[in-house]
Amino acid sequence: MTQHTFLVEIGTEELPPKALRALAEAFAIHISGELDAANVRHGEVSWFAAPRRLAVKVAALGGAQADSDVEKRGPAIAQVFDADGNPTKAAEGWARGCGITVSQAERLATDKGEWLVYRARVKGQPVQELLCAVVSRALGKLPIPKMMRWGDNETQFIRPVHTVTLLLDDGVIAGNVLGIDADRIVRGHRFMGEREISLEHADQYPQVLLDRGRVMADYLQRKETIRRDAEEAAKRLGGVADLSESLLEEVTSLVEWPVVLTARFEEKFLAVPAEALVYTMKGDQKYFPVYDAAGNLLPHFIFVANIESKDPQQIIAGNEKVVRPRLADAEFFFNTDHKQRLEDRLPRLDTVLFQKQLGTLRDKSDRIEALSAWIAGRIGADVPQAARAGLLSKCDLMTNMVFEFTDTQGVMGMHYARHDGEPEAVALAQKEQYQPRFAGDALPTTLVSCAVAIADKMDTLAGIFGIGQHPKGDKDPFALRRATLGVLRIIVEKQLPLDLQTLTEEAVRLYGEKLTNDAVVNDVIDFMLGRFRAWYQEQGHSVDTIQAVLARRPTRPADFDARVRAVSYFRTLEEAASLAAANKRVSNILAKSDDPVYKDLQASVLKDPSEITLATHLVVLREKLQPLFEAGRYQDALVELAALREPVDAFFDSVMVMADDPQVRINRLTLLAQLRKLFLQVADISLLQ
């Protein structure tokens, strides 16, 4: 069977660089999905993306849809004919819709009755008749948050469209997409190569653009070219390039023909904290900083031009000229900020609102000071240093440097605190209070930093929940989900002995009368436990494992973590399924019973050998398990409990729990309650599927 190559390229004005890759990947996914939905076989689907184009190429495309069998059920036989034996209007209407007469319809008999049915073999359409619609539907599904119109065109897209290329092998697919008639023309680089190229065959793409248009349409090839050339350039400078993935992706999306160049700046600027210089280079200019082997910033940077110049030195000089004033500003702000201590900036925090109902940043700083000290006393950190770090934690927001370079908050606080002669732990906490900033980010390194980081986040959680502004849907303006995960990660990964109950109560207490939500403590804890669920699911723990632990509502994160890992391990044991089923059975029996259970098991009432055996096992296990529970050794405890499988199975095989004798019945219910209580000291195993 003949196989074809299909190409679609949408030529646009410059696309948003941070969205380019996602758009191209989604375009390929939806083209593939639409072909599958249309029952058209195809091979590999490749995507291409450059600043002014999105393209997809499909290999081994079938020439037509596969033929399909159609079956349309009509009215029930009882409704097909009237009293005179003539077809009813409903039957005739259905038949007409199928293109047949009632007499031509077949009959379908089932156990529920007999119906008319139309069956036919439908020949698939030629693929060239489908592709224009396939492309239009795929474009309509792209993740575009905001559309725009251009000219007098009613069509909308993320950016104005200038060309639409639709080729099936060497032929143009006739049609109109996004208000543009399809053609075989693709556009080359604005300033190099051929401005317009007429493709002779879909297989020429993207090589013809590379050769004649000076456009590297293959996104991944372009990215790898930039990475390779930047690494080589850094080596020539005697350093290593900071090729952060996000910036590398953004730069790749900004250029069609990457040319990697190096430039330098005056060494005097190295007296400014590297973070401020890097913020300017990466954030404002999209430059790659260069570091030496020891991690010190070098007075060089790497940038990517979108053109091959006869005089690259002119481009280099231009970029050096652009960045110099920004670095000079950073130097000026840094030197000016040194004239005032961090502590002296505290009064200015009174002029900035944290939140209208929750007070100013000075109010927040005072609360963080108190809560940091409270936490420090419980985790073994230096209490005075934690309090001091908490008090100063927002002072750098009042500096010129942070006002101009907002992403340096915390980092500049650390540098200024060191300049002021604050203890190193206090200085470091200024930076680390914001950690972790994102999933996978590093945690604070000292206990003082941990105390301040937790205090800052818990103060925000308590305050925002306390005025009823918790996250709803996708809206989370105070980043409470991120703050919660940060608190949980710090406590769990640092194994800190903190309880969410008392921690939240203390954070709420420090607000005084400002909060209006009486249920704030429970609301915060419920929210945090919900984030626990999401976090452990991402780690690969099953939903029912997490639910089994959540049923016990443990509020000490380190303890919660130990329980989840214990239950996950328990699931791997041979005895797990049987004991989970037994726990579910026990739970149901106890829930349905109206009988009260005894405080203690009545040994004299035990008659059946299996219940005597189970009771004996429970007595022995209780003695053995208590120290394990107290030490939080839940995995060891569940391994011991796994030994109950045989006596539990034997009990249910030979004993009628709901005996007629009330004394025997209540005693057996007591035995089951004691069994369940042992498991519940870890988790509700009955919830395991």
Curated annotation (Swiss-Prot):
Subcellular location: Cytoplasm
Main location: cytoplasm
Keyword entries, A-Z: Aminoacyl-tRNA synthetase, ATP-binding, Cytoplasm, Ligase, Nucleotide-binding, Protein biosynthesis
Superkingdom of origin organism: Bacteria
Gene Ontology biological process terms from the UniProt entry: arginyl-tRNA aminoacylation; glycyl-tRNA aminoacylation
Pfam families: DALR_1 (PF05746), tRNA_synt_2f (PF02092)
Reactions this protein catalyses: tRNA(Gly) + glycine + ATP = glycyl-tRNA(Gly) + AMP + diphosphate
A GO CC annotation given for this chain: cytosol
Keyword Lyase belongs to the record: no
Coiled coil: none
Protein EC: 6.1.1.14
Main enzyme class: ligase
InterPro entries, A to Z: DALR_anticod-bd, Gly-tRNA-synth_bsu, Gly-tRNA-synth_heterodimer
Recorded GO MF terms: arginine-tRNA ligase activity; ATP binding; glycine-tRNA ligase activity
NCBIfam families: glyS (TIGR00211)
Family (UniProt): Belongs to the class-II aminoacyl-tRNA synthetase family.
Subunit structure: Tetramer of two alpha and two beta subunits.
Name this polypeptide is given: Glycine--tRNA ligase beta subunit
Organism: Sodalis glossinidius (strain morsitans)
